Amino acid sequence: MSSYARRTPVRTVLNFCTAIRQIITGEAGSVAADKGNRGQKRAPLLHRHRLHAWLYLGSAITTEVTGTVILDFSEGFQLPAQTTAAMALYAFSFFLLTRALRAVPLSVAYATWSGLGTVAVAFAGAIIHGEAVTLGRITAITAVIGGIVILNLATTRQHSARRKDV
């Protein structure tokens, strides 16, 4: 066996470890590599990963709400096409939620997903079915949104405090 063949696995492991370290510290992808953007800063990889997670979460909320609205048109599971579409959208929503959980804490992701989904379904009910918009409903929706905002702010501050301690 040549010395090159023996060094290749070790070099591969070292390169892998270096890449992981760069991803964790945000060094990877911080400067654009292509000629058109040479020297221009890009967001560190972890920040982009977090942005993607929030996009996954937004998509999960959208698919869950769409599934719920379609489920309402299934007439109690009597219409197979609407029932199948709703179940497929629910499954896809859970898939997107699990992708979001890679970078968003569970408590924040689930509260945001379920809370904003509830708010969106309430709006859909008012728009599609003409459900009454009462002061009580508006107050409840405002409370849900306020709770989600407070939870997100508290979690962001907690993560910032942890980073300063390290």
Swiss-Prot record:
Tree of life domain: Bacteria
InterPro entries recorded: Small_drug/metabolite_transptr, Small_multidrug_res
Induction annotation: Is transcribed only in the presence of nicotine under the control of the transcriptional activator PmfR. Forms part of an operon with nepA, folD, mabO and purU.
Cystine bridges: none
Subcellular location: Cell membrane
Signal peptide coordinates: none
SUPFAM superfamilies (alphabetical): Multidrug resistance efflux transporter EmrE
Transmembrane stretches, start-end: 51-71, 77-97, 108-128, 133-153
Keyword Ligase found: no
GO CC terms: plasma membrane
Gene Ontology molecular function: any one: transmembrane transporter activity
Topology in the lipid bilayer: Multi-pass membrane protein
Entry keywords, A to Z: Cell membrane, Membrane, Plasmid, Transmembrane, Transmembrane helix, Transport
Job description of the protein: Component of an efflux pump responsible for the transport of nicotine breakdown products, in particular methylamine, out of the cell. This pump apparently serves as a metabolic valve for nicotine catabolites and may protect the bacteria from the potentially toxic side effects of these compounds.
Cross-referenced PANTHER family: MULTIDRUG TRANSPORTER EMRE, SMR FAMILY PROTON-DEPENDENT DRUG EFFLUX TRANSPORTER SUGE
Family stated for the protein in its record: Belongs to the drug/metabolite transporter (DMT) superfamily. Small multidrug resistance (SMR) (TC 2.A.7.1) family. NepA/NepB subfamily.
Subunit structure: The efflux pump is composed of NepA and NepB.
Name of the protein in its database record: Nicotine metabolites export pump subunit NepB
Source species of the chain: Paenarthrobacter nicotinovorans
